[in-house]
C-alpha cells in the first residue's frame, strides 16, 4: 500500500482559556481553543530550572466540539489527536495572514484528563467511525444522561456515504 504521508499530531496540555463555541450554517458545532504544552529542563551552566511553553491552536468539529464546549474550561488538561493544517487569509488591510492549527475531526480524538471542577476523572470522546461518538467515563452519574442524549442523536453526524474518499493512487 502506497502512502501519501502521515499528518498526525498528539498533544497533552492545559487550556489557556474557555473554548469558543460557534455553529456553522448547517448547525454543526465548531470549537476554537488554545492548548499550552510545556517542557522543563535544568540549565547545565547555571543549574537553574527552565521552562518553555508552546501555545497550540486547536479546532474541534461536530460532537467533539459540542462536548468540549460543555465540559472543558480554562486550565482543563486534555489529550488531543488530530492533524496539522495551515490556513491563509487576507486581513482588513489586505495583508496575507497565516495560522497553523491542529484540526480534530473524523479520525481525531479528544480525551479529558484530570478534570478538577467535577467528579469526572476521565472521559474519552472518539469520533473515528463517523457514525456517532463513543464515550467512556468514570464516576459521573449525571454524565450518563448526556451519553444517552448524544447516542440518540447519531443522525447529526456524517453518514459514511456523505464522505467522499479518494482511494486512487496518484501515479
Swiss-Prot record:
GO biological process terms, semicolon-separated: DNA recombination; DNA repair; DNA replication
Keywords: DNA damage, DNA recombination, DNA repair, DNA replication, DNA-binding
Chain segments carrying region Disordered: 150-171
Coiled-coil segments on the chain, per record: none
GO terms of molecular function: single-stranded DNA binding
InterPro entries cross-referenced by the UniProt entry: NA-bd_OB-fold, Primosome_PriB/ssb, ssDNA-bd
Domain annotation SSB: ranges: 6-111
Xref: Pfam families: SSB (PF00436)
Ranges spanned by the short sequence motif Important for interaction with partner proteins, renumbered to the chain: 166-171
Residue ranges flagged as DNA-binding region: 55-61
GO cellular component, as recorded: nucleoid
Source superkingdom: Bacteria
Stored CDD domains: SSB_OBF
Purpose: Plays an important role in DNA replication, recombination and repair. Binds to ssDNA and to an array of partner proteins to recruit them to their sites of action during DNA metabolism.
Subunit structure: Homotetramer.
Full protein name: Single-stranded DNA-binding protein
Source organism (scientific name): Buchnera aphidicola subsp. Acyrthosiphon pisum (strain APS)
